[in-house]
Amino acid sequence: MNCEVRKYQKLNELAETNGIVVFGGREDMNIFLGELRQAFAIEQKMYNRSIAGLSVKDAVAVYDECVAPIAPETVLIHIGEADRKFFEEHPSEFDNKYRELLSHIKSQNKKCRIAVISLRNYESNPQIEEINKHLKYIADFEKCEYGNIANKKVWNPKSTMNAVSFIYDIGFIRPLKNKRPLYDLVKILFCCEA
């Protein structure tokens, strides 16, 4: 983990503030941010600060080292897969650590949009289902968005790209500089399988 943290600290020297950050674990490290940003005409800078094995127990410290320096406008948090055993043994401590992370982010940047992303649960695992219930509750309690990616969704990225392109071509979105809804970002980044 230390090697990845140092790598992100170096990359932060090149990064710009007010972007979108994916802050997750191993399965998020390979999200193709550049291609998805271009394909869906996302104007904000996007950065992936995901770390293999990232635990909610270490999340605040890792956030401070890897994410806070670039003062993101939006953070998409996808943490919990590495915490399944911790959750099983200490569910209330898991909740407290997650809420601590969200409160910490808000204390550093009150205007930061935060989305808590569920764990994928394509096999209907009861433990993951329970973790996702906790994540939903935590997101609601902390007044954050909740992105549910637990089940496979029927989604056609090509038709979404065509719709976005058409809307931009006729001038409805780009001139207004509207922020993309967080759920759209979640769908684009976490439900698009290459």
Each predicted region: which residue ranges?
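Serine-esterase "nucleophile elbow" of acetyl-processing enzymes
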Residues: 1-52, 57, 62-71
